[in-house]
């Protein structure tokens, strides 16, 4: 480490780095300003207070009150209290987390810091996510010539063992399989998808019950439903390009990127109006 280097700004992300700003504030010799970005307020970094004894914070820092969250020590709260500025990943989510319904108990802290708190929408690397130049695709296309998208759909169907069907809608999901993501709604509407002569491809992993449910659906409806439990970067590109619509039914979503990828690839995002999806 270069001990002579002094940063102007230290930018920390989520609860894992929540103590960074507190350590900067603890030592007046550190002149760097701090920014703390919340990606998901549901993860608060809670630990028993007995495990905080060796962290080295003094009473001068308001320890333990400034770190306390309903009897626990919260790394996230430390980031919210001590950072000079706070951001989150979309303007809508920034408004939502100030409410009792979406604040996960931190809404009071955020209201107290409202002058220093803002939402900045996530972006996408258009050099990587570009259907005109994407080397992961069997055919490339853009808004001037979308003929390659039909070839991508055919390739996706072949890759996942689906029936070749150019006319029926192909719905895609690229997601962590978790209750937050609302994917039980996809399972509940599977009959409607099949009634449209539609198909469903799921790429993701997460909660065992959802993994098992999508595996069962794929076994029951071979040729119409397929899933890949896990994550594969190449498959994610091919799925976004080959789908007609991408399903993003999240119950809450700080930002999300798949809907932005879908728009980039001419794939219709079907999303709940919440957070960064709104």
Where do the language-model regions lie?
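Catalytic cores of nucleotide-sugar-dependent glycosyltransferases that transfer UDP/GDP/TDP-activated
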Residues: 1-278
């Amino acid at each position: 480490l270069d001990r002579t280097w002094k940063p102007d700004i230290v930018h920390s992300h989520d609860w894992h780095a929540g103590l960074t700003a507190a350590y900067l504030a603890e030592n007046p010799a550190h002149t760097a300003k701090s920014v703390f970005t919340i990606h998901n307020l549901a993860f608060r970094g809670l630990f028993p207070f007995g495990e905080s004894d060796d962290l080295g914070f003094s009473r001068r820092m308001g320890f333990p009150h400034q770190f306390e969250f309903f009897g626990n020590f919260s790394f996230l709260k430390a980031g919210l209290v001590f950072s000079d500025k706070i951001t989150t990943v979309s303007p809508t989510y920034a408004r939502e987390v100030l409410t009792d319904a979406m604040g996960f108990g931190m809404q009071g802290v955020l209201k107290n810091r409202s002058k220093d708190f803002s939402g900045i929408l996530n972006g996408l690397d258009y050099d990587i996510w570009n259907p005109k130049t994407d080397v992961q695709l069997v055919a490339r296309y853009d808004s001037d010539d979308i003929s390659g998208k039909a070839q991508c759909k055919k390739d996706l169907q072949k890759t996942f063992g689906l029936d070749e069907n150019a006319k029926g809608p192909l719905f895609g999901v690229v997601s962590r399989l978790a209750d937050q993501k609302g994917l039980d709604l996809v399972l509940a509407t599977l009959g409607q998808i099949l009634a449209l002569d539609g198909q469903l491809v799921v790429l993701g992993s997460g909660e065992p019950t959802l993994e098992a449910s999508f595996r069962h659906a794929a076994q029951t409806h071979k040729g119409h439903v397929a899933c890949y439990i896990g994550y594969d970067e190449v498959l994610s590109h091919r799925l976004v390009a080959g789908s007609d619509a991408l399903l993003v039914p999240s119950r809450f979503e700080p930002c999300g990127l798949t809907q932005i990828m879908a728009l980039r690839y001419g794939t219709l995002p079907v999303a709940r109006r919440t957070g960064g999806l709104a």
